[in-house]
């Protein structure tokens, strides 16, 4: 789905920047039908059960039902609110308790390093040839040995234009919004919130400059009294209901919110924003591996991937899915990055020292 055109979920060049940190490339051929690829040694499971652990409101209920109907496998879905919550859960359980989990790009690399993910060789599965070439050799999992691409997008913020005459354009505006917008919603996500604060004060992701780190902490301390909730769950619903008039949001959720309330506007901050990709992986202690692999293969069918993308309003890393996207997605201001905007940058993993800095700022902010 990566083409040099603005009719895609994200501008192709920016997606290439996100996933090409290890210099991948090449064109994209038409996706084959789901059953065209020889299965080799892979035998799909036709019964049993499995548990998917994913972000809140991030896997369509109708798609879960279709998976069970198509495969005979009962699917149970459980939810978390941040990559850090997922990591803590897997570390505490030694990778047990779930069959498929959905970490973001940098967290895939972290979990691989911690020996918490099972090697699956996604490209060798029957539908593995459907993985977009630009999504195959990614910096966090070269050759897709541990992960399958799910959806990708950006993190900015949204505000209600009916509540203020001011045009908000930056993270500085988000952290110090007009009084008439009231309380502010923010995510329960250390990487996103601290990263945005660092950008706002002229810093960068994984910054080690003591002055920038202190400035980010001071900014969040000043920001805290304006905060309504620190919760990634329910942001869309709170914005639509008017419980919050400004909140940090992912672009797909922002599109869904605007579809329900037309006065909501998504902002591409002038200081830059996170460009991320989420992925299906199998924890090392998964009990139902045949069912998990069947799920991964099923989700690499373009029709199933597109169904998720259309519901969630994000881009897909599966070839052929873009042809099945809803027309409104291809023209959405939340999905199509504005002409000339170059601030969307990939989230890369921080070192342990850098993570310690993030954690200290985050814990101070949460209080």
Predicted regions and their residues:
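A ligand-binding cleft/hinge motif common to bilobed small-molecule-binding domains
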Residues: 107-110, 245-263
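Periplasmic-binding protein-like
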Residues: 153, 213-222, 260-284
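Ligand-binding "clamshell"
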Residues: 112-119, 141-144, 257-268, 330-331
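Mature extracytoplasmic/periplasmic domains
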Residues: 283-342
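Early extracytoplasmic/lumenal segment of secretory-pathway proteins
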Residues: 25-26, 35-110
């Amino acid at each position: 789905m990566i083409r040099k055109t603005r009719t895609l979920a994200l501008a192709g060049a920016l997606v290439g920047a996100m996933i090409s940190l290890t210099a991948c490339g090449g064109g994209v051929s038409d996706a084959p039908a789901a059953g065209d690829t020889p299965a080799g040694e892979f035998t799909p499971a036709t019964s049993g059960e499995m548990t998917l652990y994913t972000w809140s409101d991030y896997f369509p209920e109708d798609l879960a039902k279709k998976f069970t109907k198509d495969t005979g496998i009962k699917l149970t879905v459980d939810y978390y609110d941040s990559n850090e919550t997922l990591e803590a859960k897997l570390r505490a359980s030694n990778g047990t308790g779930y069959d498929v989990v959905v970490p973001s790009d940098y967290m895939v690399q972290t979990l691989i390093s911690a020996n918490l993910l099972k090697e699956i060789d996604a490209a060798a599965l029957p539908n593995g040839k459907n993985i977009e070439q630009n999504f195959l050799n990614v910096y966090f999992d070269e050759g897709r040995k541990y992960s399958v691409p799910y959806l990708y997008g950006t993190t900015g913020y949204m505000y209600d234009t009916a509540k203020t005459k001011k045009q908000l354009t930056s993270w500085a505006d988000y952290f110090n919004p007009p009084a008439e917008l009231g309380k502010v919603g923010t995510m329960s996500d250390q990487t996103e919130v601290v990263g945005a604060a660092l950008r706002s004060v002229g810093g960068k992701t994984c910054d080690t400059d003591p002055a920038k780190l202190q400035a980010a902490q001071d900014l969040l301390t000043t920001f805290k009294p304006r905060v309504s909730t620190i919760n990634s769950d329910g942001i869309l619903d709170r914005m639509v209901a008017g419980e919050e008039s400004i909140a940090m949001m992912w672009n797909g959720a922002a599109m869904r919110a605007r579809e329900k309330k037309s006065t909501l506007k998504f902002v591409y901050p002038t200081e830059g924003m996170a460009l991320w990709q989420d992925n299906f992986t199998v924890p090392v202690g998964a009990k139902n591996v045949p069912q998990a692999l069947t799920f991964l293969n099923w989700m690499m069918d373009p029709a199933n991937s597109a169904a998720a993308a259309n519901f969630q309003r994000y881009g897909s890393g599966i070839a052929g899915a873009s042809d099945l996207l809803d027309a409104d997605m291809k023209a959405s201001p939340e999905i199509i990055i504005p002409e000339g905007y170059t601030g969307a940058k990939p989230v890369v993993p921080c070192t342990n020292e850098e993570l310690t800095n993030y954690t200290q700022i985050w814990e101070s902010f949460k209080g």
